[in-house]
């Protein structure tokens, strides 16, 4: 059992047919169907929708979608992502980001919904309930929640918050989803 994680460079300048063939060729080599993953969050993390050959307009960030049309816009976006990614042969989206962060200075702010635990929980539920798991699975990120911590791509981050704070805020969207 295994899989591949694709990044924007893996789709650069490719057409829909080229991506489908590439993924299909990898799958044909596996004895067991592989996970074919991408993190298409929208906004600053847009691996697929950064390629105009694959998606006409890049996917918006969660906060942009929510501000534009609330949970209905989230539903429409989830359906669109599910259809586009699954048509390409991908079966796992490492999204949505359900970290709770309300401070513009926080590392995860631009990638998050930028709302409280209750609304972020509703967001997580909406994505999971709207998705079609026979086409595409989603992963809620970043368990147990980044909070206001530093970028772990740049080094080690230590969360000094107490467990009760994490339970009351950060874990709620993961439980809801």
Regions found by a protein language model. Give the residues of each.
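Phosphate/pyrophosphate-binding betaalpha-module
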Residues: 130-142, 165, 172-177
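Enzymes and membrane/adaptor proteins characterized by extended Gly/Ser/Thr/Asp/Glu-rich
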Residues: 3-119, 147-161
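Short, contiguous, pocket-lining structural segments
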Residues: 112, 119, 123, 166-169
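Conserved hydrophobic/aromatic pocket- or pore-lining residues that grip, position, or stack substrates
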Residues: 85, 127, 141, 145, ...
